[in-house]
């Protein structure tokens, strides 16, 4: 499952507070972050995402979960898009947004290394 851990002083609550809808076009694919939802314990955010690659559109959520050492961005079990380059790239972009919260943040465990230089 594609994921990226951002270690350091980042929080899902700050991500939610500063969130704005975004759209990128990368290598012909359209990547969108449309909305985000903070749960009542303030430890998890669901980000509504859309990827359009060619004629195929996929709508799904990206889960941000607060951990002791930082935040992990991944696909929740209830959403199951095809793990295309665009889906992986968008999860990496969310990791990049988390990392930008504080200069002390860094990438931790991930299987998205090829996409992290783009975020």
How should these model regions be labeled?
Residues 2-71, 76-119:
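Ser/Thr-rich, low-complexity intrinsically disordered terminal regions
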């Amino acid at each position: 499952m594609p994921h990226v851990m951002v270690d350091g002083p980042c929080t899902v609550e700050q991500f939610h507070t500063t969130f704005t809808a975004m759209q990128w076009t990368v290598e012909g694919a359209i990547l969108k972050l449309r909305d985000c939802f903070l749960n009542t314990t303030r430890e998890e955010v669901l980000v509504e995402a859309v990827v359009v690659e060619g004629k195929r559109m996929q709508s799904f959520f990206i889960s941000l979960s607060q951990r002791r050492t930082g935040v992990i961005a991944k696909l929740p079990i209830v959403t199951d898009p095809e793990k295309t380059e665009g889906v992986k790239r968008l999860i990496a972009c969310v990791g990049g947004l988390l990392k930008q919260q504080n200069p002390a943040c860094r990438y931790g465990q991930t299987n998205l290394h090829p996409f992290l230089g783009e975020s």
